[in-house]
Amino acid sequence: LNPSSLKGVPAPGIANLVFQTPMDSSADDFEPFSQYGTLVDKVELADDRMTMIYHINKDAKFSDGHPVTADDFVFSFNLLKDPEYHPISKQYFKDIKTVTKISSHKVKYTFAIYNQELPLITGQMTIFPKHVYGEKGKSFGLDFDEIAVGSGPYKIKSFEFGKHITFIK
């Protein structure tokens, strides 16, 4: 149930049905490199392109009813440093220097280098609920398969490892 697991293969659909990223790519082939807000409703990119601010949609919620907040964005970024997190993701997001909370629904991304793709890359970071996965003593790699709480349009109705998974809206 962990979309970033190093053990096994994530369940089909889990990454984009149960979990969400701040932005989603256009499904239209005529809009390459275009993204639209899923968890954010406004983006501010600095003129020098070294910082960016996301305004988090105040209506965004996780499947357990908790709101999606800046704390979840910061927590998700910090997961990239967890030794149990997937090393490919660490490499992919390495040029994002920091993610800092400005307010409950506003976060600032600071980039380590100038790279025109970094604003798009930030939009692809899966946002995990801090109140679920950030509990003291929880292991991102070991405890994740007990529960999958995400902000996506679906929840898991039932599953059996290696056999089936059923989603409900």
Language model: regions and residue ranges:
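N-terminal lobe/hinge region of extracytoplasmic solute-binding protein
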Residues: L1-D47, N78, V149
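Short, solvent-exposed loop/turn elements at domain surfaces
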Residues: L1-S4, F30-F33, S63, E117-L120, ...
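Extracytoplasmic
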Residues: L17, T38-V40, D47-R49, V68, ...
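Gly/Pro-rich hinge or "lid" segments in bacterial periplasmic/extracellular proteins
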Residues: S26-F30, Q124-K169
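Aromatic- and charge-enriched surface segment that lines or borders ligand/interaction sites
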Residues: D41-H86, I102, K108
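Surface-exposed binding/hinge segments that line
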Residues: H55, Q91-E135, P153-E160
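Solvent-exposed loop/turn segments at secondary-structure junctions
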Residues: D59-K61, L80, Y114-E117, F161-K163
